[in-house]
């Protein structure tokens, strides 16, 4: 069931977590929703397909911000919100084959996306009302896309892929619904069910800073109209010959992180917090039960060097 009152034991637990952070000089940055949906919200409302979930999210945000605003200065609304394009249920709690309104996959996805962006804006507004000194941001899985060749159509595909990433940022950072997906929506017969009140909320609920995870870059290859999203996860048929790959086929691209930082700062001019970057590797313990993690050390060093270069470029990076 969906409770009317919060779980005090759970709230008290995070009081202790934040107190412990401050004890050691750690400034917490808190993600409000990180892929952890109450089962009842998924079963009864199909996650963010329902606008009732927006109201529940508002209630949740008010609860935690009022409780922790003296302990938490930095808030993120959702984790990797754009992953809803590729893993809808994980990101939004909405299952594609359980639409309450019988929507097809494309329509459901973008209705859910709109509801999440609306919920994000409402969360930012609440943070500003309750704790004017606090900052509220957004977070996406940031991808750098390279055209597969110098063929002009591949660059068109690159722009399309990047715009599907920027769509989330443009709404959350600029407070406007961009034009560039209009043609795609028309081709896919996707209807935008936005009210004037929705548009006004998006304008008011703009993020103070932006944040992202970065794990790899990807290759854009044109395959005809209507264009298809290259995606966020790797495609083994489009490996970059200039980059090494992980055992799972993810490109290792430290320079891509510098590119990502410059792209975002040029477009939005907002401070940036890098929420995640890392690598998966096969590891084994030696006879002393130790893991000599030199590969990961080198990976992190290479990416930190590129963050430093981006800062020299003039990008305002305030945390990693």
Predicted regions span which residues?
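Active-site region of glycoside hydrolase catalytic domains
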Residues: 12-319
């Amino acid at each position: 069931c969906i409770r009317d009152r919060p779980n005090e034991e759970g709230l008290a637990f995070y009081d202790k977590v934040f107190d412990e952070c401050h004890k050691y000089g750690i400034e917490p940055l808190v993600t409000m929703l990180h892929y952890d949906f109450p089962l009842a919200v998924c079963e009864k409302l199909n996650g963010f397909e329902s606008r009732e979930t927006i109201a529940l999210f508002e209630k949740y945000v008010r609860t935690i911000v009022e409780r922790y605003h003296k302990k938490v200065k930095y808030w993120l609304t959702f984790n990797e919100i754009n992953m809803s394009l590729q893993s809808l249920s994980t990101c939004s709690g909405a299952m594609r084959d359980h639409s309450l309104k019988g929507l097809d996959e494309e329509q459901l996805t973008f209705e859910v996306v709109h509801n999440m962006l609306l919920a994000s804006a409402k969360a930012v507004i609440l943070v500003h009302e309750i704790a004017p000194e606090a900052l509220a941001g957004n977070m996406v899985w940031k991808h750098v896309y390279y055209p597969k060749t110098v063929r002009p159509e591949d660059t068109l595909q690159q722009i399309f892929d990047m715009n599907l990433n920027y769509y989330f940022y443009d709404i959350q950072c600029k407070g406007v619904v961009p034009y560039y997906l209009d043609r795609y929506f028309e081709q896919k017969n996707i209807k935008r069910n936005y009210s004037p009140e929705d548009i006004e909320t998006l304008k008011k609920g703009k993020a103070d800073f932006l944040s992202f995870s970065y794990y790899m870059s990807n290759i854009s290859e044109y395959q005809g109209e209507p264009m298809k999203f290259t995606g966020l996860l790797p495609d083994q048929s489009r490996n970059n010959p200039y980059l090494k790959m992980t055992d799972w086929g993810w490109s290792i691209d430290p320079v891509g992180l510098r590119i990502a930082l410059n792209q975002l700062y040029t477009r939005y001019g907002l401070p940036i917090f890098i929420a995640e970057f890392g690598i998966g590797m096969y590891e084994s313990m030696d006879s002393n039960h130790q893991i000599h993690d030199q590969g990961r050390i080198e990976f992190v060093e290479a990416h930190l060097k590129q963050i430093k270069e981006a800062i020299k470029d003039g990008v305002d990076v305030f945390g990693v």
